[in-house]
Swiss-Prot record:
This is Thymidine kinase. Keywords: ATP-binding, DNA synthesis, Kinase, Metal-binding, Nucleotide-binding, Transferase, Virulence, Zinc. Zn(2+) binds at residues 146, 149, 179, 182. Pfam families: TK (PF00265). PROSITE patterns: TK_CELLULAR_TYPE.
Length: 196
């Protein structure tokens, strides 16, 4: 996989998928490749993600960059000047209501790489992802196997409890990723009502 050829200055790339699919692992890989090319990279993480204060995947892989600057923020507009940065990498992009700010950075000839969930626990796309999608020059979908049946491709994020808060950060203690068959035969019955 030579992703670097697709990552051009002035472009926005988007990686989507369900939870536990490897989106953050993919971002870490991109950061290491960009650093190898001596690009100055900033990694932006939402303060809404309260799971972990480090840059770590659900599987335990941790980001140990050489020169990457790591910023935690609630809004992208609070990040400040990125004049000396070549690439902006954003994890959990769906957490940023002002994700459209990435267009400004792309206009400044920065490489923008975003990763976010394909849908909420209600199986609806997050508004920030919907707004930025038309400006993405490259989109990658990363899937995973259903955590319930282990047979089919999973694309649905299902919350294990009845909390209806849209943004509720957590891992496998709060969420399961499942296929369509398990969603309709198991989880919809348990978690009524999921509206399409």
């Amino acid at each position: 996989m030579n992703i670097i050829r697709k990552l051009k200055p002035g472009t926005i790339s988007l990686v989507l998928g369900p939870m536990f699919a490897g989106k953050t692992t993919f971002l870490i890989h991109c950061i290491y490749m960009l650093e190898h090319l001596e690009k100055k990279v900033v990694f932006i993480k939402s303060t809404k993600n309260t799971r972990d204060k480090t840059i770590k995947t659900h599987s335990g892989i941790q980001l140990r960059p050489k020169h990457c600057k790591i910023i935690e923020s609630t809004q992208l507009s609070d990040v400040g000047s990125l004049t000396d940065i070549h690439a902006v990498v954003i994890d959990e992009a769906h957490f940023f209501d002002d994700l459209i700010k990435c267009r400004t950075w792309a206009d400044e000839e920065k490489i923008i790489i975003l990763a976010g969930l394909n849908a909420s626990f209600e199986q609806k796309m997050f508004p920030p992802i919907v707004r930025i999608f038309p400006y993405c020059s490259w989109v990658k979908y990363i899937g995973r196997t259903c955590m319930k049946c282990n047979r089919h491709n999973a694309c649905f994020n299902v919350r294990k409890n009845a909390d209806k808060t849209l943004i509720l950060a957590g891992g496998s203690e709060l969420y399961v990723t499942c296929c369509n068959n398990c969603l309709k035969n198991t989880f919809i019955k348990q978690l009524q009502p999921i509206k399409y």
